[in-house]
């Protein structure tokens, strides 16, 4: 895997986690709007392996699930997990960018 593949993979992971965060934000809003006795259909982000033969994670949509009683706490835990995964992909992207820059610098010597 060269540094450009690393950048593509990390960017794909960031795109997937951003889409998951959008779904989770809708869940938080829906759980607050449902009221104490109303239930809402929670959307669960789904991921798949994508790309052209390379290992790349893509957002594959969301599947509806009846509220299991976890409510806002479960949603916030999911938001934290998705946020941390996004940050991890952003860190990998920065490392890949640094490696690409160093490779270009070495080629100039």
What is the predicted role of each segment?
Residues 1-109:
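Amphipathic alpha-helical polymerization modules
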């Amino acid at each position: 895997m060269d540094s450009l593949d690393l950048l593509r993979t990390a960017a794909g992971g960031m795109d997937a986690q951003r889409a998951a965060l959008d779904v989770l934000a809708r869940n938080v809003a829906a759980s607050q709007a449902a009221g104490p006795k109303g239930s809402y259909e929670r959307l669960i982000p789904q991921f798949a392996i994508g790309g052209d033969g390379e290992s790349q994670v893509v957002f594959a949509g969301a599947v509806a699930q009846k509220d299991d009683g976890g409510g806002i706490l479960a949603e916030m835990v999911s938001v934290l997990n998705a946020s941390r995964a996004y940050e991890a992909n952003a860190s990998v992207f920065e490392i890949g960018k640094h490696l690409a820059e160093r490779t270009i610098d070495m080629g100039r010597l």
